Design a protein with these regions (language model features):
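Internal, hydrophobic cores of structured domains that mediate oligomerization or house catalytic pockets
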Residues: 1-87
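Aromatic/basic-lined ligand-recognition segments
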Residues: 62-176
Length: 176
């Protein structure tokens, strides 16, 4: 499903033109998951410079090489390019917005879902992106039954249960 989730370009066509693939795996023996992810992004960014590179399979989707490289530029500031590592899916159903992660498990965290939010897609996406960045940066664990204080006047509940967008795994549901 990686080609079908690609955003802003015809990844299916690129995949059909592909004649070969290169698989890169970083196995952290002593490095942290964040350090291993940083190394992986650096290697893949370099490989996108090769002539004929059509796509990078990352974050559970196919990413256009230039877009992958551009997102990787945040490594110079000591940040991880979230869009290259964790896919943020967004959907609408009966006037409600939902969102989910795919790839957060690679950092030792369960996938996160927001289900049935009355907020708009942009607000839900931005909240999920900020939450994922926070979880990866701090290593904080979201636990069943916890409340997450998101502003001085607002908190959201956390529940761990079978996934909605990802039914094959248990996910953390955040009631945003």
């Amino acid at each position: 499903w990686a080609a079908e989730t690609a955003q802003g370009w015809d990844a299916v066509s690129a995949l059909q033109r592909a004649k070969s693939t290169i698989r890169v795996i970083i196995v952290p023996k002593t490095a942290t998951q964040k350090a291993a992810a940083s190394t992986l992004v650096k290697v893949l960014s370099t490989l996108t410079l090769r002539p004929g590179t059509l796509a990078v399979a990352g974050a559970h989707t196919l990413i256009e090489p230039t877009k992958y490289r551009n997102a990787s530029s945040v490594l110079g500031r000591g940040e991880l390019p979230l869009s290259n590592l964790v896919y943020l899916g967004l959907y609408e159903n009966d006037g409600e917005t939902g969102a989910y992660t795919a790839g957060l498990d690679q950092f030792g965290h369960p996938e996160i879902e927001i289900v049935g939010s009355a907020r708009g897609p942009e607000a839900v996406y931005q909240f999920l992106e900020n939450l994922v960045q926070y979880v990866i940066d701090t290593g904080s664990k979201l636990r069943d039954g916890d409340e997450l204080q998101i502003s001085p006047t607002e908190s959201v509940g956390i529940k761990f249960s079978k996934g909605v967008a990802l039914p094959s795994v248990k996910t953390v549901k955040v009631s945003y």
